[in-house]
């Protein structure tokens, strides 16, 4: 159940290994058939429209098969011919984006892991797709390689207006790579929200456990002109404005007939939030 991610933004499918991230991406590319339901892209069913839809998508799923005895440019020329990419300018532009030289005698077999990953992303963007699907694009890279990949992913999204769907299990990279987050576990999308919303949910806050959160929300809005709160369920409310007088809020709740059983100041990390949503262990 993959909802509609925003266009011209970078969205991250976040989940532990085996959560269903790669399988979901393969279904979006027609590489795996769903056991039930259907895949729709841009409002159209993928099945029966592959020739129209798939050329508008670039992807990196696992490692592409490059020829080890050819240079990066020579490898891209072969794929360009197969895909009908018209000229060498598209190849040069893709290589420039990922920081690889167009005129280079180094063979693919001599590439470092980071260079191989960059060439794979160059292949994914060479035909100027509208949508990019990148499965674990920073997996196995050193800090410098991660920073480089992060930089041109942001450029594709921010400067070139691409819609990007990334899968990841590295929490520390989320805020640097993604605008929107989807938490996936056992093949189901559990949460889908912007990074700003996610950070607010996992930031420092005051948690009230009480008899009626809907009434508590009305009291906060009416008595304190406050709307920086989130209702978790019928009995738990989070207040994100820490400058408000907690004692006066509790008094107002009680005077209006609410039963307040607990008040806590909480600070939840992104990993804690992930654990709570998935109901399991950490993401690693």
Predicted regions and their residues:
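Alpha-helix boundary recognition
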Residues: 42, 55, 175, 199, ...
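Short, charged/small-residue-rich alpha-helical element at the C-terminal edge
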Residues: 204-277, 284
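ABC transporter nucleotide-binding domain
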Residues: 151-240
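ABC transporter nucleotide-binding domains
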Residues: 4, 8-166, 171-185, 189-191
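Generic structural signal for individual residues within well-ordered alpha-helical segments
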Residues: 54, 76-77, 92-95, 147, ...
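Non-catalytic alpha-helical coupling and interface elements of nucleotide-dependent molecular machines
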Residues: 81-84, 279-283
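Residues at or immediately preceding the N-termini of alpha-helices
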Residues: 46, 50, 88, 195, ...
